[in-house]
Every structure is written in C-alpha cells, then in structure tokens.
C-alpha cells in the first residue's frame, strides 16, 4: 500500500511516549527494542494488544 505520509520511528521508552504513539496511525512494521514497565496497563496499538513488558518499537505515520 502506497502512502503519502512520512514514516518516522519512535522508540517506546516510557508510557507517555506510548500514549503519544497511540494517537498516531500505527503501521505494521515493528521490531522489538526497549523494555516497557510491567506495571503499566495494556496498550492497544494497531488493533493488537501489546503487553507492557514487551519490547516495542513502532513505525508510524506522523500526522
């Protein structure tokens, strides 16, 4: 699927950054990178529940 948006990479280093990403359209490209705090609630990104203890790094469309 072609996109006219510029794709940027964000590393989830804290819950606040995760919330910022949730307000963006998340693309399917993702790799594991940084540990998230296990005490945080579950995050739903890209229609997929991401457990807080997973390492996540998302490529997303910057709005």
Curated annotation (Swiss-Prot):
Protein name: Uncharacterized 7.5 kDa protein
